[in-house]
Amino acid sequence: MNNYIDIENKDKSITKAFIMGMKHSKKYGYDFLVCIVKTKVVMYAIKKVNDNFYKYDINNLVVISNLNNEFQDENNKYLDTNILPKVLKHY
C-alpha cells in the first residue's frame, strides 16, 4: 500500500505527504487525515463524496505540529495537547 499522497498548495505546487492515519468523526461528519509533510504533522478534515472521491477544503486544516509534538492551530496558537492520539481521540 502506498501511504503517500499529493497535496496541491495554493500556488499549485505539489507537496508529498505521508499518511499516518485516518479517523472518522460521526460528530462532525468528516474523516480526519493525519499526514507528515516535511517536518510537520498535519491533520486535514476531508468529506467523502463517493467511494472514489474525497473533498478536501484547505480551510479545514485542523492541527499543525512539528515532529516534537508541539501542536498549533492554524493561527499558530499552541494547543493544550502534546500527543497525536489525544487529538484524534477528541474527534
Predicted features along the sequence, with ranges:
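Surface-exposed beta-strand edges and flanking loops
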Residues: I7-N9, G21, I36-V37, K48, ...
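Intrinsically disordered, low-complexity N-terminal regions enriched in serine/proline/glycine
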Residues: N3, A17, K27-G29, M43, ...
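Acidic, low-complexity, intrinsically disordered interaction modules
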Residues: H24-Y28, V37-I58, V62
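Intrinsic disorder/low-complexity segments, especially N-terminal tails and targeting/processing regions
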Residues: I7, M43, K48-D51, P85, ...
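Short, charged/polar N-terminal "headpieces" of proteins
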Residues: M1-F32
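Mixed-charge, Lys/Arg-enriched low-complexity segments
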Residues: Y54-Y91
